[in-house]
Structure formats: structure tokens, C-alpha cells
């Protein structure tokens, strides 16, 4: 993005500390995201669908630290004139990287939504690498289409005598900035909020069902007047009210000693016999199924929390800049007021590229193990018992 209000020449005592801090930020962004990329390359266990999207986010943030900030430091602090060619390259690259980072967050949130809300179908799908790469490439194409053509077309709008500031030609067109703010911020935030709400709603429903008593079995119905019977499968999640001490008989079904309980409930209204047959297999498997469901709920809650943190960081880092750009677009070029708050809002966008790798990938136990593997550390952290939950 471009800091369109310009910067006065600062004294050397201020330039050196600022240059050091800006360079430190660029270095931290580069190293943090490079670790994520290298961990993904070094550990094959990380190469599943969701981590590919985190890789896409790390790539865009990595080049923010390699290209966007290093080129901007001499321009803003030492009044280095880019020239039209470098200025155009920097504008397109910076807008592309920042927007691709935003759209990668949307793609990550959609993948999280699918893995929690449609867990069975999500795990049953075997998404090929080509489809995953196509989704990653689509993020970059959409990110370029948001600002790239407009930057190229608006270059002729700029005042040819004003070559000191490297900014797109539409910075004074409020309606264009409103559209780009909608595509870069409001729409992505709305989508991530929607996916987050759906995830929490799905987890709440699953948590409510898991607290209900569950009895699986078969219902066999027979008519008193005929010898025919019908057997149907049923999974009943609630107890039947009003049933008192039904007659029961225990019999063996197989040489292995599997037993089943046959409960005959005679109804006096329709003259039918309803039998609930609960097999020992269901009784033996229910603790395992309950434990698996509990693990899935814990995993879903962790994913929901990580997505909420990712959304909060994105909103905090991007909302001030979008608001400032729309407000400042109402001023004519060269008459826009200079504010330290605008500069802070401007740098917050790039700061988001620093915190993104620490919000999920570098806190993920598998990424940490891959990081130790990169450093060739023989003593790796002991795997946690909840590794299956965090993965």
C-alpha cells in the first residue's frame, strides 16, 4: 500500500533509529515466514490441505518483508525518488502481496469451516494437489485484479510534475477507494466472520447432542394377529418416558459370548410388540465413539479459537488504514493533512504480516517439530498427548 500523504525530510538523529526499526520489522517478517515455508518443505507430514493455504499466506507475507518494506525505507526516510518504473513495480507488488495475504486468510477460514461443519465429507474428500494449487493461484489472480489494472490505468491521472510521491493515481477518488476498501477489507472480514459463526454454531450443536443419552439398537415390531414381523434399525438419542420395569430376557447369540438384551414392551393400544435389541457390540464401542467425538470437539474448538484470533488481528491491522484512506481521499492532491496516526495505520498493515505466522503455524506442534528438524536439533520436544487434537 502507499502512504499517500508524503513525509518531510527528518533529521539524521531521527532517520537512523527509524531506519533501524523499519529494517528490524522487515527482517522479522522475512525470518518468521521463511521458517513456516522451510518447515513445510522439510516435513512431509505438514503437506495436507489446510497447511498449503498457510503456506500461501506465508509466501505473500514473506515477500512483504523482502520487497515492500526494503524499497519503501529509503523512499520515505531519505526521499529517494523511485522513478516511474520502480514506482509502478513497487505499487503493483505491494498491493498484490497485501491483498493476497488477506484473501489467503479468507481461504484458510473457509477450509476451517469445511473441516468442522462438514467433517465427514471433508475427510472423505481426497483433494488432489492440482486442485489445491489451483485455489492458491486463484487467490493471487483475484488479488491482482482488485488493484493491478486500476494502478496501471490510473498512472495517466497523476500529475507528471509530482514525482516525489509514489502513489496510485486514484488516491483522490473516494469512490474508487471505497470499492477497493470493500474488496480488500469489508468483504473478507464479512466472509471470515460468517465462517467463524458457522463453526461456533456447529460446535455448539455437536456439544449439545453429545450431552444427550444415546442408545443404539434395533426395533422389531410384530402384529399380534399375524406371524410376520418387521425389523428396522434405529438410533435413539433420548429415553422413552413412561416405561415401567419392562420384562427382559438374556440370551447368547454367538460362541464368543456376545450377549444381547431383548426388551419386550407390550403396548395395550395397538396390540403390537416393540422390542429393543441392544447388542454388546454397541455397548463396547460407545466409549470409543464418545472419546473420538470428544477429541473432534476439542480439535474444532481449537480451530475456532485460532480463526478468531486470526480474524481479530486482521481487523485491527487493516480497519484504521481503510478508514483513513477514504477520509483523506476527499482532499485534493497535495492538500491532504499529515498525521502521525495515518502513518501508524499505514504500518499496521505490514505489521500484520509479522504476526500472521505466530498466530497459528509457529504455535502448531508439528511446525515446531519441523523447525527443530531444520536446525538439526537431535533432542526434539516430547509430543503431547493432545497432538491429535492440535493437528
Curated annotation (Swiss-Prot):
Residues on Cytoplasmic side: 41-52, 109-131, 196-306, 365-391
GO biological process: adenylate cyclase-inhibiting G protein-coupled acetylcholine receptor signaling pathway; chemical synaptic transmission; G protein-coupled receptor signaling pathway, coupled to cyclic nucleotide second messenger; inflammatory response; positive regulation of cytosolic calcium ion concentration; regulation of MAPK cascade
Matching SUPFAM superfamilies: Family A G protein-coupled receptor-like
Residues annotated as glycosylated: 5, 159
Topology of this chain in the membrane: Multi-pass membrane protein
Family, per entry: Belongs to the G-protein coupled receptor 1 family.
Task performed by this protein: The H4 subclass of histamine receptors could mediate the histamine signals in peripheral tissues. Displays a significant level of constitutive activity (spontaneous activity in the absence of agonist).
One term of GO molecular function: neurotransmitter receptor activity
Pfam family, one: 7tm_1
Annotated TM spans: 20-40, 53-73, 88-108, 132-152, 175-195, 307-327, 344-364
Domain of life: Eukaryota
Ranges per topology, Extracellular: 1-19, 74-87, 153-174, 328-343
Quaternary organization: Interacts with TSPAN4.
Disulfide bond residue pairs: 87-166
Cross-referenced PANTHER family: 5-HYDROXYTRYPTAMINE RECEPTOR, HISTAMINE H4 RECEPTOR
Designated name of the protein: Histamine H4 receptor
Subcellular location: Cell membrane
UniProt keyword list: Cell membrane, Disulfide bond, G-protein coupled receptor, Glycoprotein, Membrane, Receptor, Transducer, Transmembrane, Transmembrane helix
Organism: Rattus norvegicus (Rat)
A GO term from the CC aspect: dendrite
